[in-house]
Every structure is written in C-alpha cells, then in structure tokens.
Curated annotation (Swiss-Prot):
Primary location: membrane
Family matches, as SUPFAM superfamilies: Immunoglobulin, MHC antigen-recognition domain
Chain ranges on the Cytoplasmic side, renumbered to this chain: 249-266
Localization (cell): Cell membrane; Endoplasmic reticulum membrane; Golgi apparatus, trans-Golgi network membrane; Endosome membrane
Stated name of the protein: HLA class II histocompatibility antigen, DR beta 5 chain
Outcome of mutating residue 115 to V: In allele DRB5*01:06, allele DRB5*02:02, allele DRB5*02:04 and allele DRB5*02:05
Record keywords, A-Z: Adaptive immunity, Cell membrane, Disulfide bond, Endoplasmic reticulum, Endosome, Glycoprotein, Golgi apparatus, Immunity, Lysosome, Membrane, MHC II, Signal, Transmembrane, Transmembrane helix, Ubl conjugation
Annotated spans, Beta-1: 30-124
Gene: HLA-DRB5
C-alpha cells in the first residue's frame, strides 16, 4: 500500500475540495462574474538524493505568487503586499510553523521513499532512428533528423558525427517533449550538405544504457540507392519463388506417400 502525505492536513483537503467544486462545469454554468484563482503549490527540491532537501509552499493568487514558505528561511515571507498580512498571521502560529519546518522530513523525505523505486530509479531505454528531412539528399542542403523517443528519465545527451568527427555547427533541437506516459522524446537535427560516401552518426547517451547508442546514416547517390533497392527487391523475390517451390515440392511428396501400390491378390 502506497501512502502519500500532504502538508496541512484537513485544511488542505477542504481547500482542494473547495477549489474542485468552484471550478466544476456545474458551478461555472451561467456565471458571468469575474473569476479568481487561488493556488497552493508544495514543492520538494532534492540534492544528491535526500542528503539535502528544500521544501517550498507557494501561495499563488490569479497567477501571481504573493506568499512563500521556504524551509531554508524557516518562515513565511511576503512576495507582494497582498501576501504580507498572511505572512504575519502564519508566522504567529508557532505550532503551524513548526509543522511547516518539519515538512522537509514528514512530507518530502517520506514521499521520496515512497516513490523512489518508480521515479528516481526508473529507467527506460530510448529508441533511436535517423532519417533525412528531404528525399533529395546529395549536394543539397538537408536536415538529418535523429529521433530519440520513449526514454526516461529526461536527462539525455545527443551528438552528431560526420565521418567520426563531431559536428557542433548547424545542430538544432526541439528540446524535451513529454509523451504523457512518463517518457520523453526529442528531435536533434543536423543541417548539412551530404556528399556521397559520407557517414553520419547520431550518438545518444542516457542513464538507461551503459554505453552510448549509435545509429548511422550513409549518404548515397540515387544510382547507388536504386541498385541497392533493386538488389533487395531481387533477393525478396527470390525468397518468394524459393518458398513457393518448396511448398509445391513437399505437397507433391505428401501426395505420393499416400498412394498404395497395386498388385495381384493371391
């Protein structure tokens, strides 16, 4: 059984329920009055595991932070004038303030222990593919795309090499994109003018693998590509004919074995 703790106890539960009710479609139906949004964000910042932990409580009103508790400071501080009365009030509540200071252990370190196995220690190996953005590849400006998908955690390093020499100029990236299933993807592109015989390599380093993943793309002329495709097509066609021939052969053999020899009955 997984038990996640929330700071604030029943106060937080009541606040969460209230916000959910106020933001529901039924509550907003037919209401044309100005709406106000109150948010409470609780953040845990971990450094080197749980060796050093920082707890933050941020009070946000209409997308503007007005009040903050920082465990490194030990008390509430007003970010705007709107938050000053609340800061003075909460700092006067000694028991409540001690609970906030203890949240580093009771909230952050506790939940770290609960979720470490499926968050911090989780590893999913990336899938890497390389392809040109345009079909006309040689002697023209092109983008070579290195697609890295389905990996976790998000820390990753992608490099481009041309003929074993790292390429740094002309490299652009989409940055990390969340897939929505606890995995990430990214596209790292190299702007270049491919020439026949050149070998481009996308190298990916990620915590899920012990050694870098590499995928090559070789620049080939259209005639070379046509010859290669013709060779592949001929090979596949040969396999089909071979399979058909073997099928007919074994079928005939089975038919012959089922025939009984005829002779005179004495």
């Amino acid at each position: 059984m997984v038990c996640l703790k929330l700071p604030g106890g029943s106060y937080m539960a009541k606040l969460t329920v209230t916000l959910m009710v106020l933001s529901s479609p039924l509550a907003l139906a037919g209401d044309t009055r100005p709406r106000f949004l109150q948010q409470d964000k609780y953040e845990c910042h971990f450094f080197n595991g749980t060796e050093r932990v920082r707890f933050l409580h941020r009070d946000i009103y209409n997308q503007e932070e007005d009040l903050r508790f920082d465990s490194d400071v030990g008390e509430y501080r007003a970010v705007t004038e709107l938050g000053r009365p609340d800061a003075e009030y909460w700092n006067s509540q000694k028991d409540f303030l001690e609970d906030r200071r203890a949240a580093v252990d009771t909230y952050c370190r506790h939940n770290y222990g609960v979720g470490e196995s499926f968050t911090v220690q989780r590893r999913v190996e990336p899938k890497v593919t390389v392809y040109p953005a345009r079909t006309q590849t040689l002697q023209h400006h092109n983008l070579l795309v290195c697609s890295v998908n389905g990996f976790y955690p998000g820390s990753i390093e992608v490099r481009w090499f041309r003929n074993s020499q790292e390429e740094k100029a002309g490299v652009v990236s989409t940055g990390l994109i969340q897939n929505g299933d606890w995995t990430f993807q990214t596209l790292v592109m190299l702007e270049t003018v491919p020439r026949s015989g050149e070998v481009y390599t996308c190298q990916v380093e990620h915590p899920s693998v012990t050694s870098p993943l590499t995928v090559e793309w070789r620049a080939q002329s259209e005639s070379a590509q046509s010859k290669m495709l013709s060779g592949v097509g001929g090979f596949v066609l040969g396999l089909l004919f071979l399979g058909a021939g073997l099928f007919i052969y074994f079928k005939n053999q089975k038919g012959h074995s089922g025939l009984h020899p005829t002779g005179l009955v004495s």
